[in-house]
Amino acid sequence: KEAYSLNCNYEIINVDMNNIISNEAEATLLIGDDALFSYHNRQADLFYYDIGAEWKVLTGLPMVYAVWVVNNEAKLDKADLKFAHDKIVQGFKDGFNNKNLAIESVLNKVSFTSEQISEYLKVLNWDFTAKHKEALLKFYELAYNNGLIDKMPKIEFVEVE
């Protein structure tokens, strides 16, 4: 809001990828496969902004796109939490070690080439550093200050050993 001097209304809709901006909207925020598809199939009359790059310019911080979340009860069972954490970490390792096989396994389910998927995986950042934590808290602060969320979430980080 402050950065672009805009007062936006947000609405969740299904997007027609051949007509990204509906007649009722002035802009569309795409995430996930829709964003990647749009990146590789740009429509000439539209402007495209990488939300992560814009966030970095505006805040100086990295964008946090996803986090692993557990409820308060899960943190009490350290053994189960460690088991789940280890499985996730091993899954990432297996995926990276077998990247080409993993890519081939989804090619018939997505609208991307193996090269596009491989390039996408190279630019993802899988770390969660102190800067990422700061960025996530800044995101929530701005969302709250702009009336997008009713209250600031209390975020608690659990160490998994």
Functional labels for PLM-detected ranges:
Residues 1-8:
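A basic- and aromatic-enriched beta-loop-alpha substructure that forms the phosphate/nucleotide-
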Residues 9-13, 155-158:
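General small-molecule cofactor/ligand-binding pocket signal
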Residues 13-105:
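Pocket-lining segment of extracytoplasmic ligand-binding domains
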Residues 49, 53, 66-68, 119, ...:
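Flexible, active-site-adjacent loop/turn segments at secondary-structure boundaries
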Residues 76-142:
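Secondary-structure end/capping motifs
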Residues 144-161:
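Long, low-complexity C-terminal extensions of enzymes
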